[in-house]
Each structure stands twice: as structure tokens, then as C-alpha cells.
């Protein structure tokens, strides 16, 4: 039995500062405000594909793509991948599709990428849902392992990282770990993690996040309710969305509530 296509899947060639990319994208068109989704480290564009099964989002165009070093996207030089390159990739994807203003959703690495994108071009962003993206040094519980569990061999580091993640107590950690080796190129790990740590420690991310002039939501799993800054950012106008029965991965542990909170913020914009 054939089924109507929920979205279009394609690859688009881009050149970012001399790095050749073939970016794997899923997208659809529509009359309403578009949504740009940025996935986290170890995830892919498919984290957001089920937007097409959520009736409240009917009519909204969306774009989700595999970041360089991840999923089906091809990259000519994995060693060049860092957060600034990921930001430029997002800008190039938006340009390719002719998107001017948009709602922004980013998870983890994608949340940090989204923050830097929004900081550079705040006039283009209608709203920002930051799903446990880095806004403070304490958010580097995954990426800081590049320093805390240092290995000279990147393949050995990544293998050990996967095993630590598989045994972690956070909800959905084992599920996440099971596909890490298939979704991330080993050669991209160090550059991404070191860039995330450097920005979290030295990039004034909290100041950037709080200065954004549009509706913002910080979504987090209940197991991360200990984050020290939550009450402070709420007092400064950030909407908090705590997801029960969930850790770092609401799209795996509680997707229904994740979608509800995303829509609630976008309706405020």
C-alpha cells in the first residue's frame, strides 16, 4: 500500500568556507510561519519528522537536516566541524530555501547552534525553543567528557563515550547510545565537543540567551531540574517547560508533551 509523502527528502550541496557539504534535508511547504529544527549531537533530522503527525502544526512549513558530521550529510573535511561552521550551515540552508523569518527549535548541540544563530540575526527569529541547549558551563555533561576522559585516539574516546552513555541512568540513554556509532562520524566528535565546551565556558551564552528579543522557552527533563539557573531565567521572562518521565531526550521519552510545549510557545509569538 502506498502512502502520501509526509515530507520531501533531498540532499543540497553547500560550500561553507571551503568545506564541501551535501546536506541531507527533510522539509515541507505551507502557508504559515516556517520552523527550523536543529538536532543534537548523536541525533538526526528524523527526531522532528513526526511534526507531520501533529495536527496543531498543520500548515507550517518546516526544515530539519543532518548537521555536518551526522546522519546522511556528507562533509569533505570532518576536522573543520565546530559550532561556528554549524551556524553557517544553518544560515546557508535557510538561504537555499528562501526563508526570511522563522520559528527556531534546537536540542542540545542544536540548541547551542540555534542560540548563536539567533544572537547573530535576532530580527529573523520569531521564537526559540531551546531543548537543553548549552547556556552555561554546567551544561557540558556530555561534551566536557572530551577533557574529563581524555584519549589521544579519537576512535577510542568515542567508543568509551558510547559505553558510558549506554550505562548512564538518565532516561533513554541506552536507546540514544545504541545508534551513536551509526549517526556520528568519529572524526567530527572532537571538534564539536571542544567547540561546545569553549563556548559554554567563555562565550557569555547566558547573556546572549537572556538578551534575545522574542519569546524563548527552555525545555528540560525532570531529571535535570537541578540546573542552577532555572529560577533565574524564569524570573527574566524565559518560559520553562519541564518534561516529566524524561532526561535529556524529550523526543524519545515524552514526545507528545514536547510537541505541546513547542506549539504553546510558538502561539505566543
Predicted segments, located by residue:
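Gly/Ala-rich beta-loop-alpha elbow adjacent to hydrolase catalytic centers
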Residues: 106, 110, 114
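Flexible "cap/lid" loop of the alpha/beta hydrolase fold
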Residues: 115-119, 125-157
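Conserved alpha/beta-hydrolase catalytic His-Asp/Glu region
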Residues: 140, 155-211
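Short beta-strand immediately N-terminal to the catalytic nucleophile in serine-hydrolase-like folds
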Residues: 104-106, 131
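Conserved serine/cysteine hydrolase catalytic core
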Residues: 190-242, 251
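Catalytic histidine-centered segment of alpha/beta-hydrolase-like enzymes
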Residues: 246-259
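Conserved HGGG/HGGXW glycine-rich cap/lid loop of the alpha/beta-hydrolase fold
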Residues: 19-72
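Conserved acidic catalytic loop of the alpha/beta-hydrolase fold
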Residues: 84-102
